[in-house]
């Protein structure tokens, strides 16, 4: 048995020094402790849909789980039924033709795809372009894997779009890939065909890979669009998608990526050495969910529209301004000039009103004057959060 002195000599890998524990991992522990103390915190932090998948999706899962032959390892590439359903979904809603056999790779949630893509494309010491503000995992996983993170700015005055004049002036000689995320997290900015055309042109001229993370395109968005709809995009782009947001299945961990056959095969070479596929019943249920019609998305969005109105009232009560044209499942707002520090504001709201709101600084420096409110909370809870905030001293 090792003594305490011996254990003290064991150190973690050096790569852990490049990252810290995920903000929400730490903060939700604090929220849980407050709840355990009877403080009843209303969480408006993370984007975890609180509505269920469709009834037919759940029924398909239950029926398939009863099949005694469905509990073994499944193909690394995903079952054909799921890949065909993803292809049909992209054709129906995005107008994009994908070969289900070679151009689609199901994922255990699109978050793991960040790891797989970085391992497949980026050598230690090479650079990746990451948006500021942006999803923190792009930065943390890049650093863990030895890549050098180079931020590019997204600013409110530019509609939270990349500044291509600024990008053109950057040294791209060591850049391997560029992360984009539209509809955007955390800002709610929506993509346009013009933006995607510029990104594809930029990638082709600079010989880099664009990875577009696209999980929010069905939330409060009348016109879903894929970067792969742009001619030539498959040659230089990878797109992630997820069933977590569009189909209310965050805990199922089912996502996908799409690109050209070579890129998909390189990623599969990594992925097949990391996991052993997904439970067959979940894949069949996901395939069922992808067959949903327009009424499914509209039913979700009716709820989100009501919630966004309440979130807007919370923003105004806090003196924040926001763009009413945002899409996705969050509301992003700018704090008033009279507020010196966004974290002090969100901490005050947490400890006085017992409402958890995300401070924008966690998405990097361009978010330091902003807050984000999740719409993944029922109307009565949002109304109660508003009431509590109005009652703050």
Name each model feature, range by range:
Residues 126, 147, 205-209, 233-235:
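A short helix->loop->beta-strand "cap" motif at the edges of active sites that frequently abuts
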Residues 2-109, 116, 290-292, 393:
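N-terminal small-domain helix-loop-helix segment of the aminotransferase-like
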Residues 2, 150, 168, 339, ...:
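PLP-dependent enzyme catalytic core of the Aspartate aminotransferase-like
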Residues 232-305, 309-318, 392-393:
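Conserved core segment of the aminotransferase class I/II
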Residues 150, 154-225:
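Active-site phosphate-binding strand-loop segment of PLP-dependent enzymes
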Residues 120-142:
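Conserved PLP-anchoring active-site segment centered on the Schiff-base-forming lysine
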Residues 287, 303-312, 322-334, 367:
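Conserved glycine-rich beta-strand-loop-beta hairpin in the small C-terminal domain of fold type I
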Residues 37, 145, 205-206, 318, ...:
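Helix C-cap/helix->beta junction micro-motif
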């Amino acid at each position: 048995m090792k003594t305490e002195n011996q254990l003290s000599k064991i150190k973690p890998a050096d790569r852990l020094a490049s990252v810290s524990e995920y903000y929400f991992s730490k903060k939700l522990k604090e929220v849980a402790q407050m709840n355990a103390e009877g403080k009843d915190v209303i969480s408006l932090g993370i984007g975890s849909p609180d509505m269920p998948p469709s009834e037919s999706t759940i029924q398909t899962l239950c029926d398939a789980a009863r099949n005694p032959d469905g509990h073994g390892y499944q193909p690394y590439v995903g079952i054909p039924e799921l890949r065909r359903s993803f292809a049909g979904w992209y054709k129906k809603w995005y107008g994009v033709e994908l070969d289900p056999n070679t151009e689609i790779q199901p994922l255990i949630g699109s978050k793991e795809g960040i790891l797989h893509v970085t391992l497949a494309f980026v050598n230690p010491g090479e650079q990746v372009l990451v948006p500021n503000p942006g999803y923190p995992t792009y930065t943390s996983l890049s650093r863990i894997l030895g890549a050098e993170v180079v931020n590019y700015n997204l600013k409110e005055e530019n509609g939270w779009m990349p500044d291509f004049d600024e990008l053109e002036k950057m040294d791209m000689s060591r850049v391997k890939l560029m992360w984009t995320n539209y509809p955007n997290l955390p800002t709610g900015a929506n993509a346009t065909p013009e933006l995607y055309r510029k990104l594809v042109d930029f990638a082709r001229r600079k010989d880099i890979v664009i990875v577009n993370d696209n999980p929010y395109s069905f939330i409060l968005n009348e016109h879903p669009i894929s970067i792969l709809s742009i001619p030539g995009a498959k040659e230089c782009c990878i797109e992630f998608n997820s069933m977590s947001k569009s189909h209310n299945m965050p805990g199922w961990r089912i996502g996908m990526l799409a690109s050209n056959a070579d890129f998909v095969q390189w990623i599969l070479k990594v992925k097949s050495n990391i996991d052993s596929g997904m439970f067959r019943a979940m894949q069949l249920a996901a395939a069922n969910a992808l067959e949903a019609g327009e009424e499914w998305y509209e039913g979700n969005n009716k709820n989100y529209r009501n919630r966004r109105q309440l979130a807007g009232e919370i923003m105004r009560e806090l003196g924040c301004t926001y763009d009413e044209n945002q899409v996705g499942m969050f509301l992003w707002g700018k704090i008033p000039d009279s507020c010196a520090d966004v974290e002090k504001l969100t901490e005050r709201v947490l400890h006085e009103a017992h409402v958890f709101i995300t401070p924008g600084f966690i998405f990097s420096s361009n978010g330091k004057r902003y807050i984000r409110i999740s719409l993944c909370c029922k109307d009565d809870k949002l109304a109660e959060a508003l009431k509590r905030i109005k009652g703050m001293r």
